[in-house]
């Protein structure tokens, strides 16, 4: 079975333009992501999907494979679907281009559900929430699932709502596991044939309310399998986030 990791990479960004090419210890960020994705045991090949020639040139310079995509795509899923239509992969992994510290093991963890169960169209990851700040923050997407790992809902709101313990919420309750809740890790794995189906679905009510594209899948009755991971990464949305990445690398 052929498994391809695709890294959608845009140059334009409201908070950090050109972040895909941001220098991290002598290499562009997109190269760090590419090299880490290539180390995943289950991944057969890695492709960067971009509509920007500057990013494409940088990828070619370090010997990576790049696919040019339409500049009119509204979402990363649309860009991914375009690439998936051009390749012969059975499974396509969407690796975020702004995750230079992603652990290759995370990618393997997210892929396995699709290898174990051919009826699953899509999978993703979650990790434990360990601070009250993350639990309350609308920038941290929470997720709940059933006992077999099927996602029930994603939300920017606190999820679940601990009605009887709301006034006693403290960091130590999350660290100890007394209050068990999870945040979504934005790594997605798809069966190739499901990507055009997903891309062809119209935006849904809950998706538009929460501004979470993955809710479109649930609202249309498709399953998303979710796996808990112990690994955490740092998404680079701002120059300040890049500083955190550099500090983490210096500590290693």
UniProtKB/Swiss-Prot annotation:
GO terms for molecular function: 3-deoxy-manno-octulosonate cytidylyltransferase activity. It catalyses: 3-deoxy-alpha-D-manno-oct-2-ulosonate + CTP = CMP-3-deoxy-beta-D-manno-octulosonate + diphosphate. One of its GO terms (cellular component) is cytosol. InterPro entries: Cytidylyl_trans (IPR003329), KdsB (IPR004528), Nucleotide-diphossugar_trans (IPR029044). NCBIfam families: kdsB, PRK05450.1-3, PRK05450.1-5, PRK13368.1. Belongs to the KdsB family. This is 3-deoxy-manno-octulosonate cytidylyltransferase.
